[in-house]
């Protein structure tokens, strides 16, 4: 799993691959609950999708550019564009469904 900053995120986005990005913060209890799910999906989809995290406290401008109003928020990208978004703690199947639909 990749921990993105602005530069690494923009580089990955430009590659156009399917991406799943978790916008989170260390103090966020729901984010901590979702963390293991994101990590297991990163392992499961390695080589097929880019899965990573953006710490909203460290990358506030990036979070604002995607109008993140609550965390955790997971945004899916393909061909450099947002294709879907899930907010809050969701079961793994919710993320798997979006990933599989767009592979």
Say what each PLM segment does.
Residues 9, 21, 38, 55, ...:
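Residue-level signature of catalytic and energy-coupling elements of molecular machines
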Residues 2-18, 60:
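A short beta-strand-turn-helix
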Residues 76-103:
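Non-catalytic, surface beta->alpha helical segment in thiol-disulfide oxidoreductase systems
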